[in-house]
Structures are given as structure tokens and as C-alpha cells.
Amino acid sequence: MRHYEIVFIVHPDQSEQVPAMIERYKTTITTHGGQIHRVEDWGRRQLAYMIEKLAKAHYVCMNIECDQTTLDELEHAFKFNDAVLRHLIVKMKKAETGPSPMMKEVQREEAKKAAAAQPTEAQA
């Protein structure tokens, strides 16, 4: 089996359905004997360019290990899901299990927001 990194972008109006989508894709992978090494929900982020007149979308990154038939099934699911705006599947040499650079940035942003919220709570 090969290692893959999958990034897919979901329509911002469908953000509440992302956890169910991730669970459905994880079930597809595990039932076919694959493994999931990392799942990161990057949240709603600014797009580099407009897609279907949208400036923001919900990003998800998955690092998996599966065979070609499972990968074909996932790609088919991405293509025919109207909520998925774009998807990218990249073959990796080995499994990535640590946090991605994008996830580190998300964690830094959340830490800044939490730090900014603490002084205002102390003043109130």
C-alpha cells in the first residue's frame, strides 16, 4: 500500500457537514484495509483565488495509507460531492504523522486569539 496526502476544500455553507464527511471518508479507508495517519481540519480560510465566486472555504488535510481501489473510490466520492470545491491527492514516500506547517499556523492563530481574549476578560 502507498502513502497519500489528500487536501480537499469544502463550500463554506457546508462547514457544519465537514466532520460527517471526514468520518465517511475515514470509514471508506479503514473498511478497505487502509490506515489513517493524520487528519487535520484547518477550518475556514481565505482562498488564493475565487472559486465559484467564493473567497473563503473550509480546508481538510488527511494523510492515509491505502491501495489503488480505495483511492479511486475516494476520488470518485470527491468528484460527485457538490460540497467539495477542489481536491488534491499527492503520493508520499512515507507516512506523515506530525502536525503540518498549516496546522502549526492555525494553532498559532488560536493562541493569539486566546491571549488577546484573556486581558479583556480580566478588565471586565
From Swiss-Prot:
A Pfam family per the record: Ribosomal_S6
Keywords: Ribonucleoprotein, Ribosomal protein, RNA-binding, rRNA-binding
Descriptive protein name: Small ribosomal subunit protein bS6
Any single GO CC term annotated in Swiss-Prot or TrEMBL for this entry: cytosolic small ribosomal subunit
Compositionally biased intervals (Low complexity): 114-124
Cited InterPro entries: Ribosomal_bS6 (IPR000529), Ribosomal_bS6_sf (IPR035980), Ribosomal_S6_plastid/chlpt (IPR020814), Transl_elong_EF1B/ribsomal_bS6 (IPR014717)
Membership in a protein family: Belongs to the bacterial ribosomal protein bS6 family.
Protein encoded by which gene: rpsF
Biological process terms in GO annotation: translation
Top-level taxonomic group: Bacteria
Organism of origin: Burkholderia vietnamiensis (strain G4 / LMG 22486) (Burkholderia cepacia (strain R1808))
Job description of the protein: Binds together with bS18 to 16S ribosomal RNA.
GO MF annotations, alphabetized: small ribosomal subunit rRNA binding; structural constituent of ribosome
Region (Disordered): 96-124
